[in-house]
């Protein structure tokens, strides 16, 4: 059902769907909703298995029979369209390795970016697993959750005491994001409000109209 749902949504949206997958950080809630209760190791196994299964059930081809440790299907015809990209928010080494082997994108989580210890210690695990599986590590894109304010005037400091991005003027945003792409290999950014603030339509509008086009233009010229 998951494979059918996401491939249908991808087709209807013109390819604007991304499937986010995780190993399950809330086992009690998953069990309450009828899901299997896995140990942490089993959850990572199931996570990797289901990503492979979703991909195999898309893009046409012969009927799929799968007898895995956690999932089984018999003679299911793949959807006639490709599966959407699968992104994960893996944290532990085993799930990071699974991301490298089978996923298409990785979000470090906790607003981590290329300056963070989380990124510096985790991305090599993804890359090593991808290479060991015969993949080009660059196939696994890094996409960042980027919180922060968009201010009218430049800020004296654009990062907090822990080195996390907190925002700045449009020019400061453009400089930071462009550096992330051109110098550190980032593939995309997701803007969200800092802290627990509500979504701000004005900020999202400025992001879409002023920041994103400027970053794309610079990357296209220099990339």
Give the role of each language-model region.
Residues 1-223:
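Active-site-adjacent structural elements that line small-molecule/cofactor binding pockets in enzymes
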């Amino acid at each position: 059902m998951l494979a059918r749902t996401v491939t249908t949504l991808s087709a209807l949206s013109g390819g604007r769907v991304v499937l986010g997958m995780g190993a399950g950080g809330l086992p009690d809630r998953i069990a309450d909703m009828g899901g299997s209760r896995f140990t942490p190791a089993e959850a990572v196994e199931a996570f990797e298995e289901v990503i492979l299964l979703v991909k195999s059930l898309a893009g046409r081809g012969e009927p799929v029979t799968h007898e895995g440790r956690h999932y089984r299907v018999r003679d299911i015809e793949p959807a006639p369209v490709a599966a959407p990209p699968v992104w994960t928010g893996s944290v532990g080494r085993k799930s990071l390795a699974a991301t490298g082997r089978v996923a298409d994108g990785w979000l470090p989580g906790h607003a981590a970016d290329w300056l963070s210890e989380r990124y510096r210690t985790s991305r090599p695990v993804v890359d090593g697993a991808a290479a060991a599986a015969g993949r080009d590590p660059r196939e696994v894109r890094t996409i960042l959750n980027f919180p922060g304010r968009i201010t009218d005037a430049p800020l004296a400091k654009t990062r907090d005491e822990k080195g996390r991005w907190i925002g700045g003027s449009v020019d400061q945003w453009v400089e930071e994001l462009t550096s992330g792409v051109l110098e550190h290999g980032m593939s995309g950014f997701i803007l969200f409000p800092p802290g627990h603030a509500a979504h701000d339509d004005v900020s999202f509008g400025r992001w879409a109209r002023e920041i994103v086009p400027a970053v794309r233009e610079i990357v296209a010229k220099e990339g």
